[in-house]
């Protein structure tokens, strides 16, 4: 069955190449620039491009603000987060901007428009208050009622299923949801936004300022309404009750998206009042949201840290197209590197642990908090005390909030930093929150990746917390472990922990040469390309080193960092954890999740209990976590 007309975008198959359609406008600007020998500031073609950029930034501003959970968590209308399904559905949210820019280009390039001089003379006038008055009048008397009745029509069969249902695909709105729709809906919005402008220009009182001001204010109000964050104080409506019928709120719009039978207006609820579709609980709910009554304490917290400056931009409140895919050095982020560097310095001076993302699992709220420190700072001796203070404050805050389990990420549990979390547990024995390093499950993931027919392995980082546990576990399986370490004292200490009959399977090596015939390398310490050359062809590098080693050898294979896929019933997950694939988290994160789901009452800090590796692994599988 053929799709209904105006229900799909003609450039849908182009993907990101759709932006080539701006080429004609760019060419016009370049041509005028060449002819004038300077920037064509009086060109409508240039203004079309500038307006497109300004509109995109408006939506991005509200999107970023709405996803800064450390600012907005308490005033979110719907507390849940956006999931990957919604991210993908709204991927081409800016189609309406492209459509309206092309319509504008058609008008600017139209011989009839040029001949009647409807647009071009207005460039000489940046501001005309009469035009603003006319535009406001036409917006209230024409645009608002037109949108209201058209919107109500779109909610009736068969128009809803054909054209509008996709826009209501999720109850959690974002500013990008505002732009997500069919061509028919976008054409309707084009008429609604264009009527006041057309009226002002036809009356000869249009101006450049009116175009920018009206369009950007329109986008600003739509973005605000879809932001899912309540920004208008209820005191404003209490002081001036009439205002509640003149301006909508994010709560007002959210009710429409969830219930679908009320609150149809564009910006002015008075039209819902006149049309009998006003949801009367809008302002009471708005008050509750603004006062933070929707707020909920998390049940589980994963305490992460920033890896580096580029990775600091891989967060939900920067670019969703980047944060919803595994981290990579996207060229589009390079111009923002100086800004990110400035924020690094700012956080170093005066920031504290903050909330980055959240999801739900079986009715429980899981959050990721981030210590405002970057990877390199963990190796500065003078920074050690400050980092531990940040982690300690986060643990105490979680304890006050009633968090059940807090899991430490990567460098936050560094042995030299705080003994794998023992520092905090010993200092605060009365803690109710369980502190977990998650390394038991990390070890289990690495060990279960090793083929069952392997007879010997080469282990770097052999005397680390993970290296020790892996070596002791493998020797019990009668697998020979070549432990690379220069410290005989550390090696012997680990060897003595093994049962006497298995100690022979632990072998100390001080160089890479003994591993020339071993095809299973367990990498817990960084390997340079030169060191990797000692591995024979066909070697597989299993990794538990941060950051992961560079895949230098083409005749070898490289495993990823230990990770697990969250259960299928996870909700509100729309963010990729560093280089992990969608739905996959680091094993130490997963270890904390398992600890919480099992309801274990002990802290998991310090040395790894080798006897619990299989216990934790089986518990993870039981709860639906799977190897990534």
From Swiss-Prot:
Transmembrane segments: 37-57, 131-151, 191-211, 299-319, 331-351
InterPro entries documented for this protein: CER1-like_C (IPR021940), Fatty_acid_hydroxylase (IPR006694), NAD(P)-bd_dom_sf (IPR036291), Sterol_Desaturase_Related (IPR050307)
The name this protein goes by in its record: Very-long-chain aldehyde decarbonylase GL1-2
Enzyme Commission code(s) on record: 4.1.99.5
Pfam family, one: FA_hydroxylase
Signal peptide range: none
Annotated tissue distribution: Expressed in germinating seeds, radicals and leaves.
Organism: Oryza sativa subsp. japonica (Rice)
Protein's GO biological process: aldehyde biosynthetic process; alkane biosynthetic process; response to abscisic acid; response to water deprivation; wax biosynthetic process
A GO term for molecular function: iron ion binding
SUPFAM superfamilies per UniProt: NAD(P)-binding Rossmann-fold domains
Oligomer and partners: Homodimer.
Keyword ATP-binding in record: no
Gene Ontology cellular-component annotations: endoplasmic reticulum membrane
Phenotype on disruption: Early leaf-rolling at the reproductive stage. Reduced wax accumulation (lower total proportions of aldehydes, fatty acids, alkanes and alcohol) in leaf cuticle leading to an increased cuticular permeability (e.g. chlorophyll leaching) and a subsequent altered drought resistance due to rapid water loss.
